[in-house]
Amino acid sequence: MSKLLVVKGHPLTAEYSLSLKGLDAFVKSYKSAHPEDEIEELDVFSADIPTLNTELVSAMFAGENAELTASQKDKLARFAGFTDQFLSADKVVIANPMYNLMIPAELKSWVDTVNVAGKTFKYTAEGPVGLANGKKVLHLQANGGVYGAQDPATVYMSAIFNFIGSDFRQIAVEGHAYDPEKTEELLAEFIKKVELEAQAF
């Protein structure tokens, strides 16, 4: 039995989101193909993920014997909790829109929790080495324009998850803002690809 972590990186519901429509289709198809697997869901917009601000980063570099505030201790513990949640999953699927050429800020905060030296990668004399080897990561993204996987959001997500050693792949639905009349056609193609990926994921 494997564990799938489902990461919702959109502030709205599937009614208003093509990426979440794809995510819903993926989960439904995945459950059909892998009925024994455990599925855990994470909504980054409601999870209160600690951001890398002054309070948290100063706590990270404070040292073992430093006196931390209760707030710093809480943020460190919650940050580590999201790292551990990611590490406990065998497979991860992430769905998000592209905002201003990038992923939403809340999703970026989550990504920061899964790119941690000593946990998901390590430094060696030959350079950094990923520690999340064998972990499948599927990224579902909706782009109003057409970017062919060269948009900064996709490049960033690919770089991060390949850096930590995971098996990263992406399926995007794009171009619906250019030609709204083709939205349903583009969505149908997206859903078909997502469902097929879920069967073998």
Curated annotation (Swiss-Prot):
Catalytic activity reported: 2 a quinone + NADH + H(+) = 2 a 1,4-benzosemiquinone + NAD(+); N,N-dimethyl-1,4-phenylenediamine + anthranilate + 2 NAD(+) = 2-(4-dimethylaminophenyl)diazenylbenzoate + 2 NADH + 2 H(+)
Listed EC numbers: 1.6.5.-, 1.7.1.17
Keyword Flavoprotein listed: yes
Cofactor comment text: Binds 1 FMN per subunit.
Keywords from the UniProt entry: Flavoprotein, FMN, NAD, Oxidoreductase
Species: Lactococcus lactis subsp. cremoris (strain SK11)
Gene designation per UniProt: azoR
Domain of life from the UniProt record: Bacteria
Protein name: FMN-dependent NADH:quinone oxidoreductase
Cofactors required: FMN
Family listed: Belongs to the azoreductase type 1 family.
Subunit structure, as described in the record: Homodimer.
GO MF term set: electron transfer activity; FMN binding; oxidoreductase activity, acting on NAD(P)H as acceptor; oxidoreductase activity, acting on NAD(P)H, quinone or similar compound as acceptor
